[in-house]
A protein has these predicted regions:
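Short, glycine-biased loop/turn motifs at secondary-structure junctions and
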Residues: 1-284
């Protein structure tokens, strides 16, 4: 993806076999995994441009950007922003008081975007509508990808397993969740977005588009492009009304393969991440 330079769909998709599409999907997944694990300094200009555009979509002015070198340094700066539980409470309250939290509005437009992208998928999208087999409605098994295709598992299911689910395992379960748990120390943290570690859903819808299995309108491509730019360009970020706190990417990331998986999933090694200020959380 360039500017949304979602890359163009592969040529002559009508004659492309499921196996060929899968091989192309593996390359796309690796591109996004590399972004998710990048240790290059943040592209601050791109980040601030895309965050300003996303703020504008919820009718908010450009915030002041506060850059920090680690999530640890961000914590004192984001005190008072709503936690995830507080955002859910606002959504569930039939008569909420006051102005909706900015983070809630951001979550809403992100969810709406994902719904529109799903509607552009040419097959039933497992992201929103679980695809099941047979009269009993059993879920499709997760098998080695080529074996799965040969066994009749739909390509759309294999792509969801092999891109969306696999990148979530690597970048959420394998990275951001243990780091966040270490950072929180058992207490609540304000809701945030994860920049490069939000790659799973962006990569999934990018791959479907590039494989010729989804069609998105110009506005959706532009909107997706801004979220993609954040994945390619920065670490975690906490949005506030006046200030948006953004974390640079780590200085060091060391991973190891997750045993028994089919889609090149990885996880952090113990102590496998160090941020630019020296914060080096020790992971169990």
């Amino acid at each position: 993806m360039r500017r949304y330079a979602a890359a163009e769909p592969v040529a002559d998709v009508r004659s492309t076999s499921a196996h060929d599409r899968w091989q192309e999907a593996v390359k796309i997944r690796q591109e996004w995994l590399d972004h998710g694990l990048s240790t290059q300094p943040a592209d601050r200009r791109t980040v601030e441009h895309s965050l300003t555009a996303i703020y504008a979509r919820i009718s908010r002015p450009k915030p002041r950007f506060e850059w920090v070198d680690s999530p640890y340094k961000a914590v004192p700066l984001v005190a008072g922003l709503p936690t995830l539980d507080q955002l859910y409470g606002w959504i569930r309250d039939p008569h909420p008081r006051g102005t909706p939290p900015l983070a809630g509005d951001l979550a809403m437009i992100e969810s709406q975007l994902r719904g529109v992208l799903s509607a552009g998928v040419s097959h039933t999208d497992p992201e929103l509508s679980p695809v099941r087999r047979g009269k009993r409605g059993e879920p499709w098994p997760e098998l080695p990808p080529l074996k799965a295709l040969d066994a009749g598992v739909p390509l759309g299911v294999v792509l969801h397993q092999g891109i969306r689910t696999a990148l979530h395992r690597s970048l959420a379960q394998g990275f951001r969740i243990p780091i966040r748990n270490t950072l929180a120390g058992g207490g609540p943290l304000p809701a945030c977005w994860y920049g490069q570690q939000d790659a799973a859903w962006v990569a999934y819808y990018d791959a479907l588009h590039r494989l010729g299995l989804a069609s998105y309108g110009p506005d959706e491509l532009e909107h997706l492009g801004h979220w993609a730019a954040l994945v390619r360009s920065c670490g975690w970020w906490w949005p506030g009304e006046e200030v948006c706190v953004v974390v640079d990417r780590p200085e060091v990331i060391r991973t190891e393969p997750v045993p028994g998986t089919w889609h090149d999933e990885v996880r952090l090694r113990r102590g496998g991440v160090r941020y630019r200020d020296g914060w080096h959380p020790l992971l169990a």
